[in-house]
Amino acid sequence: MEDKKKFMAKAIELSINSANTIGGPFGSVIVKDNEIIAEGSNKVTSSNDPTAHGEVVAIREACKKLNTFDLSGCEIYTSCEPCPMCLSAIYWSRLDKIYYANTREDAKKIDFDDSFIYLEIPKKIGDR
């Protein structure tokens, strides 16, 4: 349990640093064999890339480091509940587990509201 707290603390530290410097308040770490192998923080505004969320940045780094798209055997710790895009990337990369500190409701309170996406998903394509 102590390691899980350490990994989450690192994700939160990345989110704080990101909010104070280059982007939104989101950070993530990917862990394999009880070691951090990749880190990511929100770089949407600094890179002009709307997909550069902390989770996606960490996934890209881990895939590059391990030279594979399959992150089975790895876990992700993230400062906030993943948005639909990040959750999809987590599933596609086959990460074993997700741990998050804040909920999407917490994110909504600080103007990071993705509830409109969740409302769109169940709609028929013609109604989107």
Name each model-derived stretch.
Residues A11, S15-S18, S28, A38, ...:
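Small-residue (primarily alanine) positions within well-ordered alpha-helices
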